[in-house]
A protein has these predicted regions:
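Short amphipathic alpha-helical segment within the helicase RecA-like ATPase core
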Residues: 1-269
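A generic structural signal for tightly packed, nonpolar segments enriched in small/aliphatic residues
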Residues: 55, 204-500
Length: 500
Protein backbone atom coordinates (compact mmCIF):
# COMPACT_ATOMS: atom_id res chain seq x y z
CA UNK A 1 0.00 0.00 0.00
CA UNK A 2 1.39 3.38 -1.02
CA UNK A 3 1.12 6.07 1.64
CA UNK A 4 1.52 9.82 1.30
CA UNK A 5 0.57 13.14 2.88
CA UNK A 6 -1.58 15.96 1.56
CA UNK A 7 -1.52 19.45 3.01
CA UNK A 8 -4.55 20.62 1.06
CA UNK A 9 -7.89 21.35 2.69
CA UNK A 10 -9.79 18.04 3.00
CA UNK A 11 -12.59 19.33 0.76
CA UNK A 12 -10.08 20.00 -2.03
CA UNK A 13 -8.53 16.52 -2.11
CA UNK A 14 -9.47 14.59 -5.25
CA UNK A 15 -9.97 10.97 -4.21
CA UNK A 16 -12.37 8.06 -4.57
CA UNK A 17 -13.33 8.53 -0.93
CA UNK A 18 -12.55 10.92 1.91
CA UNK A 19 -12.79 9.41 5.41
CA UNK A 20 -13.49 11.69 8.36
CA UNK A 21 -14.02 11.01 12.05
CA UNK A 22 -17.33 11.74 13.76
CA UNK A 23 -17.23 11.88 17.57
CA UNK A 24 -20.03 11.71 20.08
CA UNK A 25 -20.02 14.93 22.12
CA UNK A 26 -23.41 14.22 23.68
CA UNK A 27 -24.17 15.03 27.30
CA UNK A 28 -27.00 13.28 29.12
CA UNK A 29 -30.00 13.35 26.74
CA UNK A 30 -28.52 15.86 24.27
CA UNK A 31 -27.15 14.06 21.19
CA UNK A 32 -24.29 15.85 19.47
CA UNK A 33 -22.41 14.07 16.69
CA UNK A 34 -19.68 16.35 15.37
CA UNK A 35 -17.51 15.89 12.27
CA UNK A 36 -13.96 16.40 13.50
CA UNK A 37 -12.82 18.65 10.67
CA UNK A 38 -11.97 22.34 10.56
CA UNK A 39 -13.08 22.36 6.91
CA UNK A 40 -16.54 23.96 6.69
CA UNK A 41 -17.26 22.33 3.33
CA UNK A 42 -16.70 18.85 4.80
CA UNK A 43 -18.94 19.57 7.77
CA UNK A 44 -21.63 20.97 5.46
CA UNK A 45 -21.49 17.85 3.29
CA UNK A 46 -22.38 15.74 6.32
CA UNK A 47 -24.77 18.04 8.16
CA UNK A 48 -28.02 16.79 6.59
CA UNK A 49 -27.43 13.13 7.43
CA UNK A 50 -26.27 14.07 10.92
CA UNK A 51 -29.42 16.15 11.38
CA UNK A 52 -31.57 13.07 10.75
CA UNK A 53 -30.02 11.35 13.78
CA UNK A 54 -28.81 8.50 11.58
CA UNK A 55 -25.20 9.39 12.39
CA UNK A 56 -24.47 9.38 16.12
CA UNK A 57 -20.69 9.05 16.36
CA UNK A 58 -21.02 5.63 17.99
CA UNK A 59 -17.78 3.64 17.82
CA UNK A 60 -17.27 1.96 14.42
CA UNK A 61 -20.52 3.30 13.00
CA UNK A 62 -19.92 3.82 9.26
CA UNK A 63 -21.96 5.92 6.85
CA UNK A 64 -20.94 6.24 3.20
CA UNK A 65 -22.24 9.25 1.27
CA UNK A 66 -22.05 9.26 -2.53
CA UNK A 67 -21.36 12.41 -4.53
CA UNK A 68 -21.22 14.68 -1.46
CA UNK A 69 -21.92 18.31 -2.28
CA UNK A 70 -19.18 20.91 -2.00
CA UNK A 71 -16.14 18.62 -1.87
CA UNK A 72 -14.00 17.02 -4.57
CA UNK A 73 -14.05 13.47 -3.18
CA UNK A 74 -16.41 11.07 -4.97
CA UNK A 75 -17.56 9.66 -1.61
CA UNK A 76 -17.50 10.74 2.02
CA UNK A 77 -17.07 8.07 4.71
CA UNK A 78 -18.22 9.11 8.17
CA UNK A 79 -16.45 7.02 10.82
CA UNK A 80 -17.88 6.91 14.33
CA UNK A 81 -15.13 7.20 16.91
CA UNK A 82 -17.18 6.94 20.09
CA UNK A 83 -17.14 9.37 22.98
CA UNK A 84 -15.03 12.47 22.34
CA UNK A 85 -13.80 12.51 25.95
CA UNK A 86 -12.11 9.12 25.64
CA UNK A 87 -10.94 9.25 22.02
CA UNK A 88 -7.23 8.49 21.69
CA UNK A 89 -4.57 7.61 19.15
CA UNK A 90 -5.26 3.92 19.89
CA UNK A 91 -8.89 4.41 18.88
CA UNK A 92 -7.80 6.34 15.79
CA UNK A 93 -5.61 3.38 14.79
CA UNK A 94 -8.62 1.08 14.99
CA UNK A 95 -10.76 3.53 13.01
CA UNK A 96 -8.20 3.58 10.22
CA UNK A 97 -8.32 -0.21 10.12
CA UNK A 98 -12.12 -0.08 10.04
CA UNK A 99 -12.03 2.43 7.17
CA UNK A 100 -9.78 0.13 5.15
CA UNK A 101 -11.91 -2.95 5.81
CA UNK A 102 -15.11 -1.06 4.94
CA UNK A 103 -13.81 0.42 1.70
CA UNK A 104 -11.96 -2.58 0.32
CA UNK A 105 -15.14 -4.65 0.73
CA UNK A 106 -16.68 -2.19 -1.74
CA UNK A 107 -13.75 -2.58 -4.18
CA UNK A 108 -12.44 0.91 -3.49
CA UNK A 109 -8.68 0.87 -3.98
CA UNK A 110 -7.59 4.35 -2.89
CA UNK A 111 -8.84 6.84 -0.33
CA UNK A 112 -7.87 9.80 1.83
CA UNK A 113 -8.16 10.02 5.60
CA UNK A 114 -8.44 13.44 7.23
CA UNK A 115 -6.58 13.73 10.51
CA UNK A 116 -9.30 14.56 13.07
CA UNK A 117 -9.42 18.36 13.35
CA UNK A 118 -5.80 18.15 12.30
CA UNK A 119 -4.95 16.85 15.74
CA UNK A 120 -6.43 19.80 17.65
CA UNK A 121 -9.98 19.09 18.84
CA UNK A 122 -9.28 15.53 19.96
CA UNK A 123 -6.07 16.37 21.79
CA UNK A 124 -4.12 13.90 19.65
CA UNK A 125 -0.70 15.12 18.57
CA UNK A 126 -0.62 15.41 14.78
CA UNK A 127 2.46 13.22 14.45
CA UNK A 128 0.94 10.53 16.67
CA UNK A 129 -2.28 10.78 14.67
CA UNK A 130 -0.55 10.28 11.33
CA UNK A 131 1.37 7.29 12.65
CA UNK A 132 -1.79 5.76 14.14
CA UNK A 133 -3.69 6.10 10.86
CA UNK A 134 -0.92 4.46 8.84
CA UNK A 135 -0.42 1.58 11.29
CA UNK A 136 -4.16 0.98 11.52
CA UNK A 137 -4.53 1.03 7.76
CA UNK A 138 -1.90 -1.68 7.36
CA UNK A 139 -3.54 -3.78 10.09
CA UNK A 140 -6.91 -3.48 8.33
CA UNK A 141 -5.44 -4.29 4.92
CA UNK A 142 -4.24 -7.77 5.97
CA UNK A 143 -6.35 -10.79 5.03
CA UNK A 144 -5.48 -14.36 6.08
CA UNK A 145 -7.27 -16.23 3.27
CA UNK A 146 -4.14 -16.97 1.20
CA UNK A 147 -5.07 -20.52 0.30
CA UNK A 148 -8.59 -20.01 -1.03
CA UNK A 149 -8.69 -20.96 -4.71
CA UNK A 150 -11.30 -18.27 -5.42
CA UNK A 151 -9.58 -15.60 -3.34
CA UNK A 152 -10.38 -12.04 -4.35
CA UNK A 153 -7.47 -9.69 -3.86
CA UNK A 154 -9.39 -6.85 -2.26
CA UNK A 155 -6.78 -4.51 -0.89
CA UNK A 156 -6.34 -0.79 -0.57
CA UNK A 157 -3.51 0.25 -2.89
CA UNK A 158 -3.08 3.88 -1.85
CA UNK A 159 -3.74 5.95 1.28
CA UNK A 160 -3.43 9.73 1.52
CA UNK A 161 -3.46 11.34 4.95
CA UNK A 162 -4.71 14.91 4.99
CA UNK A 163 -2.91 16.87 7.70
CA UNK A 164 -1.43 20.17 8.78
CA UNK A 165 1.81 20.79 10.63
CA UNK A 166 5.55 20.47 10.26
CA UNK A 167 6.07 18.58 7.00
CA UNK A 168 9.32 16.87 8.01
CA UNK A 169 7.92 15.69 11.36
CA UNK A 170 4.74 14.40 9.73
CA UNK A 171 6.71 12.60 7.01
CA UNK A 172 8.86 10.95 9.70
CA UNK A 173 5.68 9.85 11.51
CA UNK A 174 4.30 8.48 8.25
CA UNK A 175 7.46 6.48 7.62
CA UNK A 176 7.53 5.12 11.19
CA UNK A 177 3.90 4.08 10.93
CA UNK A 178 4.58 2.37 7.63
CA UNK A 179 7.57 0.42 8.99
CA UNK A 180 5.71 -0.71 12.11
CA UNK A 181 2.52 -1.56 10.21
CA UNK A 182 4.39 -3.57 7.58
CA UNK A 183 6.38 -5.36 10.30
CA UNK A 184 3.22 -6.25 12.21
CA UNK A 185 1.78 -7.74 9.03
CA UNK A 186 5.08 -9.56 8.41
CA UNK A 187 4.61 -11.20 11.81
CA UNK A 188 0.98 -12.02 11.04
CA UNK A 189 2.03 -13.59 7.75
CA UNK A 190 4.47 -15.90 9.56
CA UNK A 191 1.88 -16.92 12.14
CA UNK A 192 -0.82 -17.47 9.53
CA UNK A 193 1.13 -20.11 7.60
CA UNK A 194 0.07 -23.74 8.18
CA UNK A 195 2.59 -25.83 10.06
CA UNK A 196 3.32 -28.11 7.10
CA UNK A 197 4.70 -25.02 5.38
CA UNK A 198 6.02 -23.08 8.38
CA UNK A 199 8.37 -25.68 9.84
CA UNK A 200 11.21 -24.65 12.18
CA UNK A 201 13.55 -24.79 9.19
CA UNK A 202 11.30 -22.55 7.10
CA UNK A 203 10.92 -20.08 9.98
CA UNK A 204 14.69 -19.87 10.08
CA UNK A 205 14.84 -19.30 6.33
CA UNK A 206 12.23 -16.54 6.50
CA UNK A 207 14.18 -14.88 9.31
CA UNK A 208 17.41 -15.17 7.33
CA UNK A 209 15.85 -13.67 4.21
CA UNK A 210 14.34 -10.77 6.14
CA UNK A 211 17.64 -10.10 7.91
CA UNK A 212 19.47 -9.86 4.59
CA UNK A 213 16.89 -7.36 3.32
CA UNK A 214 17.11 -4.99 6.30
CA UNK A 215 20.74 -5.37 7.36
CA UNK A 216 20.53 -7.62 10.42
CA UNK A 217 23.02 -10.34 11.28
CA UNK A 218 21.38 -13.76 11.37
CA UNK A 219 22.43 -17.22 12.49
CA UNK A 220 20.29 -20.35 12.27
CA UNK A 221 21.53 -23.44 14.11
CA UNK A 222 20.25 -27.00 14.37
CA UNK A 223 20.31 -29.86 16.87
CA UNK A 224 24.11 -30.06 17.07
CA UNK A 225 24.29 -26.49 18.40
CA UNK A 226 21.61 -27.22 21.00
CA UNK A 227 23.66 -30.16 22.25
CA UNK A 228 26.89 -28.13 22.17
CA UNK A 229 25.26 -25.42 24.30
CA UNK A 230 23.75 -28.08 26.59
CA UNK A 231 20.23 -26.78 25.95
CA UNK A 232 18.63 -29.82 27.53
CA UNK A 233 15.26 -28.17 28.09
CA UNK A 234 14.95 -27.07 24.45
CA UNK A 235 16.21 -30.40 23.12
CA UNK A 236 13.83 -32.29 25.40
CA UNK A 237 10.95 -30.76 23.44
CA UNK A 238 12.60 -31.04 20.03
CA UNK A 239 13.65 -34.69 20.33
CA UNK A 240 10.12 -35.97 19.68
CA UNK A 241 9.80 -34.49 16.19
CA UNK A 242 11.17 -35.60 12.84
CA UNK A 243 11.43 -31.92 11.89
CA UNK A 244 14.82 -30.54 12.97
CA UNK A 245 14.74 -27.67 15.46
CA UNK A 246 16.07 -24.20 14.68
CA UNK A 247 17.87 -21.87 17.06
CA UNK A 248 17.45 -18.50 15.34
CA UNK A 249 19.61 -15.55 16.41
CA UNK A 250 19.10 -12.04 15.01
CA UNK A 251 21.53 -9.26 15.93
CA UNK A 252 21.11 -5.52 15.57
CA UNK A 253 24.40 -3.78 16.38
CA UNK A 254 24.34 -0.12 15.28
CA UNK A 255 27.37 2.14 15.40
CA UNK A 256 27.27 4.54 18.32
CA UNK A 257 25.00 2.30 20.38
CA UNK A 258 24.78 2.73 24.14
CA UNK A 259 27.55 0.54 25.56
CA UNK A 260 25.93 -0.45 28.84
CA UNK A 261 22.58 -1.58 27.40
CA UNK A 262 22.08 -4.75 25.38
CA UNK A 263 18.44 -5.76 24.98
CA UNK A 264 17.50 -9.41 24.57
CA UNK A 265 14.23 -10.49 22.94
CA UNK A 266 13.36 -14.16 23.39
CA UNK A 267 10.49 -15.80 21.50
CA UNK A 268 8.76 -19.16 21.75
CA UNK A 269 8.68 -20.70 18.27
CA UNK A 270 6.67 -23.92 18.57
CA UNK A 271 5.57 -24.27 14.95
CA UNK A 272 3.03 -26.92 15.92
CA UNK A 273 2.06 -28.06 19.39
CA UNK A 274 0.26 -31.37 19.77
CA UNK A 275 1.03 -31.35 23.48
CA UNK A 276 3.48 -34.21 22.98
CA UNK A 277 2.82 -37.36 25.00
CA UNK A 278 0.40 -35.29 27.13
CA UNK A 279 -1.58 -34.84 23.94
CA UNK A 280 -4.16 -32.09 23.50
CA UNK A 281 -7.83 -32.67 22.66
CA UNK A 282 -8.54 -32.77 18.92
CA UNK A 283 -11.05 -29.93 19.15
CA UNK A 284 -9.21 -26.72 18.31
CA UNK A 285 -5.81 -28.35 17.80
CA UNK A 286 -5.56 -26.78 14.34
CA UNK A 287 -4.95 -23.45 16.07
CA UNK A 288 -1.69 -24.77 17.46
CA UNK A 289 0.05 -23.58 14.30
CA UNK A 290 -0.17 -20.25 16.14
CA UNK A 291 2.10 -21.48 18.94
CA UNK A 292 5.09 -19.82 17.31
CA UNK A 293 3.48 -16.37 17.54
CA UNK A 294 5.91 -15.21 20.23
CA UNK A 295 8.88 -16.07 18.03
CA UNK A 296 7.25 -14.49 14.97
CA UNK A 297 6.61 -11.33 16.99
CA UNK A 298 10.29 -11.06 17.87
CA UNK A 299 11.28 -11.59 14.22
CA UNK A 300 8.85 -8.89 13.10
CA UNK A 301 10.01 -6.54 15.85
CA UNK A 302 13.62 -6.97 14.73
CA UNK A 303 12.58 -6.04 11.19
CA UNK A 304 11.07 -2.78 12.45
CA UNK A 305 14.05 -2.08 14.71
CA UNK A 306 16.53 -2.54 11.86
CA UNK A 307 14.60 -0.09 9.66
CA UNK A 308 14.00 2.51 12.41
CA UNK A 309 17.67 2.39 13.47
CA UNK A 310 17.58 3.22 17.21
CA UNK A 311 21.02 3.54 18.82
CA UNK A 312 20.80 0.50 21.09
CA UNK A 313 22.02 -3.09 20.69
CA UNK A 314 19.32 -5.74 20.38
CA UNK A 315 19.63 -9.51 20.07
CA UNK A 316 16.63 -11.74 19.40
CA UNK A 317 16.65 -15.47 20.12
CA UNK A 318 13.86 -17.61 18.69
CA UNK A 319 13.61 -21.24 19.77
CA UNK A 320 11.76 -23.10 17.02
CA UNK A 321 10.62 -26.71 17.10
CA UNK A 322 7.53 -28.89 16.97
CA UNK A 323 6.13 -30.58 20.08
CA UNK A 324 5.20 -34.05 18.88
CA UNK A 325 4.42 -37.48 20.39
CA UNK A 326 6.69 -40.27 19.21
CA UNK A 327 8.89 -43.07 20.48
CA UNK A 328 11.64 -40.47 20.89
CA UNK A 329 9.52 -37.88 22.71
CA UNK A 330 10.10 -36.89 26.31
CA UNK A 331 7.62 -38.34 28.81
CA UNK A 332 5.99 -37.21 32.03
CA UNK A 333 8.40 -38.10 34.82
CA UNK A 334 11.53 -37.44 32.75
CA UNK A 335 14.17 -35.05 34.08
CA UNK A 336 15.88 -32.59 31.75
CA UNK A 337 18.95 -30.48 32.55
CA UNK A 338 18.60 -26.92 31.28
CA UNK A 339 21.46 -24.84 29.89
CA UNK A 340 21.73 -23.09 33.26
CA UNK A 341 22.36 -26.43 34.99
CA UNK A 342 18.95 -26.52 36.70
CA UNK A 343 17.18 -29.88 36.66
CA UNK A 344 13.54 -29.92 35.54
CA UNK A 345 11.06 -32.69 36.28
CA UNK A 346 8.64 -33.03 33.37
CA UNK A 347 5.12 -33.24 34.78
CA UNK A 348 3.27 -32.34 31.58
CA UNK A 349 4.84 -32.41 28.12
CA UNK A 350 2.27 -29.83 27.01
CA UNK A 351 4.04 -27.28 29.21
CA UNK A 352 6.79 -27.15 26.60
CA UNK A 353 6.95 -23.43 25.86
CA UNK A 354 8.52 -22.60 29.20
CA UNK A 355 11.16 -25.27 28.56
CA UNK A 356 12.42 -23.75 25.32
CA UNK A 357 12.23 -20.23 26.80
CA UNK A 358 14.27 -21.35 29.81
CA UNK A 359 17.24 -22.12 27.58
CA UNK A 360 16.59 -19.03 25.48
CA UNK A 361 16.72 -16.73 28.50
CA UNK A 362 19.89 -18.39 29.74
CA UNK A 363 21.53 -18.07 26.32
CA UNK A 364 20.56 -14.40 26.07
CA UNK A 365 22.28 -13.75 29.38
CA UNK A 366 25.33 -15.68 28.16
CA UNK A 367 25.46 -13.41 25.10
CA UNK A 368 25.63 -10.38 27.39
CA UNK A 369 22.05 -9.12 27.28
CA UNK A 370 21.44 -6.71 30.15
CA UNK A 371 17.63 -6.55 29.91
CA UNK A 372 15.30 -9.31 28.71
CA UNK A 373 11.81 -9.51 27.23
CA UNK A 374 10.18 -12.78 26.22
CA UNK A 375 6.91 -13.32 24.38
CA UNK A 376 5.00 -16.57 24.15
CA UNK A 377 1.58 -18.11 23.69
CA UNK A 378 2.35 -19.77 26.99
CA UNK A 379 -0.76 -20.66 28.99
CA UNK A 380 -4.47 -21.20 28.64
CA UNK A 381 -4.66 -19.93 32.20
CA UNK A 382 -3.93 -16.37 31.09
CA UNK A 383 -7.04 -16.53 28.90
CA UNK A 384 -9.10 -17.58 31.93
CA UNK A 385 -7.64 -14.66 33.89
CA UNK A 386 -7.72 -11.90 31.27
CA UNK A 387 -9.89 -13.16 28.43
CA UNK A 388 -9.05 -12.28 24.85
CA UNK A 389 -8.41 -8.60 25.62
CA UNK A 390 -5.23 -8.15 27.67
CA UNK A 391 -1.74 -9.58 27.35
CA UNK A 392 -0.52 -10.98 30.65
CA UNK A 393 2.58 -9.03 31.69
CA UNK A 394 5.04 -10.15 34.37
CA UNK A 395 8.18 -8.38 35.57
CA UNK A 396 10.90 -9.13 38.11
CA UNK A 397 12.02 -5.49 38.27
CA UNK A 398 9.78 -2.47 38.88
CA UNK A 399 11.98 -0.02 36.95
CA UNK A 400 11.94 -2.36 33.96
CA UNK A 401 8.17 -2.62 34.28
CA UNK A 402 7.70 1.16 34.41
CA UNK A 403 9.81 1.60 31.29
CA UNK A 404 7.88 -1.08 29.43
CA UNK A 405 4.52 0.25 30.66
CA UNK A 406 5.32 3.68 29.20
CA UNK A 407 6.19 2.07 25.87
CA UNK A 408 3.02 0.00 25.99
CA UNK A 409 0.93 3.11 26.65
CA UNK A 410 2.46 4.86 23.65
CA UNK A 411 1.73 1.79 21.52
CA UNK A 412 -1.88 1.61 22.72
CA UNK A 413 -1.94 -2.16 23.31
CA UNK A 414 -3.88 -3.76 26.18
CA UNK A 415 -1.62 -5.35 28.79
CA UNK A 416 -2.12 -6.11 32.47
CA UNK A 417 0.56 -6.81 35.08
CA UNK A 418 0.16 -10.00 37.10
CA UNK A 419 2.04 -10.86 40.32
CA UNK A 420 5.27 -12.78 40.84
CA UNK A 421 5.22 -13.08 44.63
CA UNK A 422 7.74 -15.50 46.12
CA UNK A 423 4.90 -17.45 47.73
CA UNK A 424 4.02 -18.83 44.29
CA UNK A 425 7.39 -20.59 44.13
CA UNK A 426 5.89 -23.42 46.18
CA UNK A 427 3.88 -24.33 43.09
CA UNK A 428 6.94 -25.27 41.02
CA UNK A 429 8.88 -27.30 43.60
CA UNK A 430 9.87 -30.85 42.71
CA UNK A 431 10.64 -33.73 45.05
CA UNK A 432 13.31 -35.17 42.74
CA UNK A 433 14.64 -32.18 40.75
CA UNK A 434 15.17 -28.44 41.18
CA UNK A 435 11.76 -27.52 39.75
CA UNK A 436 8.78 -28.97 37.87
CA UNK A 437 7.66 -27.70 34.48
CA UNK A 438 3.97 -27.64 35.45
CA UNK A 439 2.38 -26.78 38.77
CA UNK A 440 -1.24 -26.96 39.97
CA UNK A 441 -4.10 -25.60 37.87
CA UNK A 442 -4.72 -22.62 40.12
CA UNK A 443 -2.54 -19.64 39.21
CA UNK A 444 -1.42 -21.37 36.02
CA UNK A 445 -0.14 -18.29 34.19
CA UNK A 446 1.71 -17.15 37.31
CA UNK A 447 3.22 -20.59 37.86
CA UNK A 448 4.60 -20.54 34.31
CA UNK A 449 6.07 -17.08 34.85
CA UNK A 450 7.61 -18.20 38.15
CA UNK A 451 9.28 -21.03 36.25
CA UNK A 452 10.77 -18.58 33.73
CA UNK A 453 11.89 -16.25 36.51
CA UNK A 454 14.28 -18.99 37.62
CA UNK A 455 16.15 -18.60 34.33
CA UNK A 456 16.06 -14.81 34.03
CA UNK A 457 17.72 -14.79 37.47
CA UNK A 458 18.80 -11.25 38.46
CA UNK A 459 18.59 -9.78 34.96
CA UNK A 460 15.73 -7.25 34.60
CA UNK A 461 13.06 -9.15 32.70
CA UNK A 462 9.58 -8.83 31.24
CA UNK A 463 7.43 -11.84 30.31
CA UNK A 464 4.51 -11.39 27.92
CA UNK A 465 1.94 -14.19 27.85
CA UNK A 466 0.10 -13.55 24.57
CA UNK A 467 -1.92 -16.77 24.53
CA UNK A 468 -5.28 -14.97 24.58
CA UNK A 469 -4.36 -12.16 22.22
CA UNK A 470 -2.05 -13.54 19.53
CA UNK A 471 -5.01 -14.34 17.30
CA UNK A 472 -8.49 -12.89 16.88
CA UNK A 473 -11.27 -15.39 17.46
CA UNK A 474 -13.59 -13.46 15.12
CA UNK A 475 -13.56 -10.57 12.68
CA UNK A 476 -13.51 -7.13 14.26
CA UNK A 477 -14.29 -3.87 12.47
CA UNK A 478 -10.58 -3.02 12.29
CA UNK A 479 -8.90 -6.42 12.02
CA UNK A 480 -9.55 -9.79 10.40
CA UNK A 481 -10.04 -13.04 12.27
CA UNK A 482 -6.67 -14.74 12.65
CA UNK A 483 -3.20 -13.63 13.78
CA UNK A 484 -3.05 -10.20 15.40
CA UNK A 485 0.66 -9.36 15.66
CA UNK A 486 0.04 -8.25 19.25
CA UNK A 487 2.94 -6.86 21.33
CA UNK A 488 5.06 -5.88 18.33
CA UNK A 489 4.19 -2.20 18.62
CA UNK A 490 4.97 -2.18 22.34
CA UNK A 491 8.29 -3.94 21.80
CA UNK A 492 9.33 -1.43 19.15
CA UNK A 493 8.41 1.49 21.41
CA UNK A 494 10.31 -0.16 24.27
CA UNK A 495 13.48 -0.47 22.20
CA UNK A 496 13.18 3.08 20.86
CA UNK A 497 12.81 4.34 24.42
CA UNK A 498 16.27 3.07 25.35
CA UNK A 499 17.82 5.04 22.50
CA UNK A 500 16.14 8.37 23.29
Amino acid sequence: MNTNLSFSAPSQVETDCLAVVVLDHSEKDKPAAIVESADTAVRDAAKDVIATGEVTGKAFETTLLHRPAGIRAKRLLLLGGGKAKTFSAAELLKLAGAAVRTLKSKSIRAFAFALPENGVATGIDGNDGVRAIVEGAFVGNFDPDYYKSDRKDQKIDALTIVAKGDQKALEDALQTGRIVGESQNFTRDLVNEPSNRMTPTMLGERARKMAAEVGLKCEVHGADKLKELKMGAFWGVAQGSDEPPALIILRYEPEGATKDVHLGLVGKGITFDTGGISIKPADGMEKMKYDMAGGATMIGAMRAIALLKPKVRVTAIILATENMPSGKAQKPGDVQIAMSGKSIEIINTDAEGRLVLADGLCYARQLGCTHLVDAATLTGAVVVALGYVNVGLFANDDQMYERFAKANKRAGENMWRLPLDDDYKENIKSSIADIVNAGPRHGGAINAAMFLKEFAEDTPWIHLDIAGTAWMEENKPWIAKGPSGVALRSLVEFVKGWAS
